[in-house]
Design a protein with these regions (language model features):
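N-terminal periplasmic/intermembrane-space "pro-region" immediately following the signal or transit peptide
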Residues: 6, 13, 20-101
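Outer membrane beta-barrel
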Residues: 80-109, 121-237, 255, 259-261, ...
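Repeated loop/turn-to-beta-strand initiation elements of outer-membrane beta-barrel proteins
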Residues: 146-147, 179-186, 223-227, 265-270, ...
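Outer-membrane beta-barrel "beta-signal"
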Residues: 26, 427-439
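Outer-membrane beta-barrel translocator domains and adjoining extracellular loop/strand segments
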Residues: 103-108, 163-170, 193-200, 238-246, ...
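Residues that define the transmembrane beta-barrel architecture of outer-membrane proteins
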Residues: 85, 125-134, 167-171, 176, ...
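Detector for outer-membrane/organellar transmembrane beta-barrel domains
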Residues: 261-384, 389
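Transmembrane beta-strand segments that form the barrel wall of outer-membrane beta-barrel proteins
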Residues: 149-160, 227-233, 273-278, 367-380, ...
């Protein structure tokens, strides 16, 4: 926290120490109307060049990313007279109020995996108020002579510690140029356009919204086809038993996708993604390292049926890919020992799918959505015991209302269930209310 405060102070001091002034111009680019400030060296006030302002606004519009949990375009842009460098600071203030009833989830987010399997006085009801997903971001666009348009982006929220600790957390920090993304960003396996907005921060349990360090290359053709390939930091969660041990990973996860955009303004798309993992572990019996291969495939997409109706979906299947299915993330099922031969290790099959529909009563102002999501863990060689996770369900219905272009109110109902291998099942319900302001 001290480091964060000191960083803000340093930025302020540097900004004040530079002998320059900022001239404001209100610029309207269709529905996007930010205030553009021009920096002039030497202390002279300069109203700025309208062409430079339009160029700066276009830079931010053309590099703006939409989809699940993505912020709006910034309200304020600072640019140089030649628009070679533009900077925006913004953020989102969010307050979620929730009430669990008929069973409470042991998580600040609605995660079916965390539904308690025994009913007790502690797991019947719960009320929460949470602002930890409020976030700040900084985005710079540099028009480089050698690299073309360069985007530098970083954002943070306050989910860095235990629930309600409000410790700052780095969400993303990356640079982009010539199709390359280098740094920390949302995993390439996640299709940001394949899930509707939810009040619940995590979203459908079969989705895969997660951050990771990576080197990625994306390419999009004018005909709507696109592809991407990435190497991402591996993270393995396993149950090793007495004959195996964890070791540091040696090979990044390899992820690739192909995508086709179609329909009105190419608002619809279908994407096929794949991930391959070479996961290292140590064989204590043989005294040497070995590997197990994890893999996964996913079909995802968004279809704009009409301006009034949108459909969303994704389906994933694979082995050893807990990092890429939200309900299983962090669970020890990437690699497990074989109970029929404890000298062997194995990966477990797992899958998830979700589908949702959104009805735009007043497009971009008032809409309602509902969806169903399910995750399953498969058996292999009798590894899973009766009390271990087998299946999780996630059902939601919500309504969003934009009181103004920047202020949003939302109401949501969630139902979730967990079933273990012994077919014992438990469920939970949650009501969410959200107020959110983008700035």
């Amino acid at each position: 926290m001290k480091l964060f405060k000191h960083s803000i102070l340093v930025v302020a001091v540097v900004a004040l120490s530079i002998n320059q002034s900022w001239a404001q111009v209100y610029h309207d680019e269709g529905d996007y109307s930010p205030s553009v400030y021009t920096s002039t060296l030497g202390g002279d006030h300069h109203r700025g060049d309208s062409k430079a302002h339009k160029h700066a606004v276009r830079d931010f519009m053309e590099t703006h990313r939409t989809g699940f949990q993505q912020p709006m375009t910034p309200q304020f842009i600072f640019t140089t007279p030649d628009s070679r460098f533009s900077l925006a600071l913004g953020g989102v203030v969010t307050l979620r109020t929730s009430y669990d009833f008929g069973g409470a989830v042991d998580n600040i987010d609605f995660v079916p995996y965390n539904i308690p399997m025994s009913n007790s006085y502690q797991s019947k009801q719960r009320v929460m108020m949470d602002a930890s997903t409020s976030r700040l971001y900084m985005k710079a666009v540099i028009n480089s002579q050698y690299l073309g348009r360069v985007v530098v982006y970083t954002d943070m929220d306050f989910r860095g510690g235990e629930e309600f600790s409000y410790i700052p957390r780095l969400r993303s920090a990356y640079m982009q140029f010539k199709g390359l993304t280098i740094g920390r960003d949302i995993t390439t396996f996640c299709d940001l356009g394949a899930a509707p907005q939810t009040v619940d921060f995590q979203g459908p349990n079969a989705y895969n919204f997660a951050f990771n360090e990576m080197i990625r290359y994306d390419y999009q053709t004018r005909g709507g086809f696109g592809f991407g390939v990435a190497a991402e930091r591996p993270s393995v969660s396993a149950t090793y038993g007495e004959n195996f041990s964890s070791v540091m990973q040696r090979v990044p996860d390899g992820i690739a996708y192909v995508q086709y955009k179609f329909g009105r303004d190419r608002q619809s798309h279908l994407r096929l993604s794949g991930v391959v993992r070479d996961m290292y572990l140590h064989n204590n019996l043989e005294g040497k390292n070995t590997t197990k291969v994890g893999w996964g495939v996913q079909l995802s997409g968004h279809i704009e049926v009409t301006r009034w109706v949108d459909l969303y979906m994704n389906g994933t299947y694979g082995e050893g890919i807990t990092s890429y299915i939200q309900d299983l993330s962090g669970s020890p099922y990437d690699i497990v020992y074989n109970p029929e031969n404890r000298a062997q290790a194995q990966t477990l099959p797992m899958w998830g799918w979700q589908a949702a529909a959104q009805v735009n009563i007043l497009p971009d102002v008032l809409w309602v959505a509902a969806g169903y999501s399910e995750v399953g863990l498969g058996e292999k060689n009798g590894y899973l015991s009766d009390s271990q996770y087998r299946r999780g369900q996630y059902v939601f219905a919500n309504a969003f209302y934009n009181i103004s272009p920047r202020l949003t109110l939302a109401l949501e109902y969630l139902y979730g269930s967990r079933k273990d291998m012994n077919d014992i099942r438990n469920s939970a319900n949650r009501i969410n209310i959200m107020a959110q302001y983008n700035f």
